[in-house]
């Protein structure tokens, strides 16, 4: 399986606190059947001011430490980027780490605030599209505005966005509403990816296998294979080829 959303780089956001926790997270992922993992630390202007250059250095260090620890996982780096008007300057300067490219279009893991869908979100996503950037919206099922007004899902889809569900939402870890939205989106064929959004060993570990079983029961083995393997593999091919 491919996990395209995780916070496994140590000490740079609200994910792994240190190298020991990073390695523990990688071991959990490996034991769960994950073969490829993309570190997607937050880029949230004013809170987590991570840069593409620094992240590339950080992933190189983690790759070496994982190798030294005998962990056999393919690792790559991108970012989970918070929607903010100030991102425009970073886009124009070529400073955003994309999570992949398909058919010459760059893909960006674009996070909405957890509490709401910001005003002007549609204009910003349209602007990204004009820059040859397609947004993947992570964990839409956990956004409070979307929970209250599911029509946002339809609007985001109309804008060309793809969706990535959190594996633990499908299991019910984020509440009944997030689970119900996840199931509804899966049944309607609105989901392109499922990922762990791993942050910590105890509370938010990188586990996908149980969610994959649930998705298989819900929409079939072939569709589950697309969400957990085929789609993320195709998306991130350029990251793992580097």
Protein language model features and the residues they cover:
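Short acidic/histidine-rich active-site segments
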Residues: 190-206
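Non-catalytic positions within long, well-ordered alpha-helices that form the structural scaffold/packing
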Residues: 30, 129, 157, 186-187
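Active-site neighborhood of phospho(di)ester-bond hydrolases with catalytic His/Asp-centered motifs
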Residues: 2-4, 38-40, 76-80, 136-138, ...
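Extended substrate/RNA-proximal surfaces in nucleic-acid metabolism proteins
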Residues: 49-164
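Mid-to-C-terminal alpha-helical segments outside catalytic/metal-binding sites
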Residues: 208-209, 213-242
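Active-site environment of divalent metal-dependent phosphoester hydrolases
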Residues: 44-47, 82-84, 142-146, 170-173, ...
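Short loop-to-alpha-helix "cap/lid" segments that border enzyme active sites
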Residues: 175-184
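An N-terminally biased module of ancient metal coordination in phosphate/nucleic-acid-related enzymes
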Residues: 1-71, 154
């Amino acid at each position: 399986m491919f996990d395209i959303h995780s916070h496994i780089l140590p000490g740079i956001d609200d994910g792994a606190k240190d190298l020991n926790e990073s390695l523990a997270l990688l071991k959990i992922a490996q034991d769960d059947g994950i073969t490829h993992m993309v570190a997607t630390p937050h880029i949230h202007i004013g809170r987590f001011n991570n840069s593409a250059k620094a992240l590339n250095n950080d992933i190189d260090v983690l790759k070496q430490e994982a190798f030294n620890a005998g962990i056999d996982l393919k690792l790559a780096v991108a970012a989970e980027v918070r929607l903010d008007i100030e991102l425009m300057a970073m886009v124009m300067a070529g400073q955003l780490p994309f999570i992949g490219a398909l058919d010459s279009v760059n893909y960006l893991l674009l996070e909405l605030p957890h509490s709401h869908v910001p005003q002007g979100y549609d204009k910003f996503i349209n602007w990204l599209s004009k820059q040859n950037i397609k947004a993947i919206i992570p964990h839409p099922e956990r956004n409070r505005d979307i929970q209250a007004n599911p029509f946002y899902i339809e609007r985001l889809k109309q804008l060309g966005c793809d969706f990535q569900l959190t594996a633990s939402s499908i299991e019910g870890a984020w509440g009944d509403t997030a689970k119900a939205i996840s199931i509804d989106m899966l049944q309607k064929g609105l989901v392109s990816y499922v990922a762990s959004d791993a942050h910590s060993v105890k509370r938010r570990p990188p586990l996908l296998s149980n969610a994959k079983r649930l998705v298989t029961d819900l929409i079939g083995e072939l569709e589950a294979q697309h969400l957990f393997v085929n789609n993320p593999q195709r998306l991130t091919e350029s990251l793992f080829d580097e």
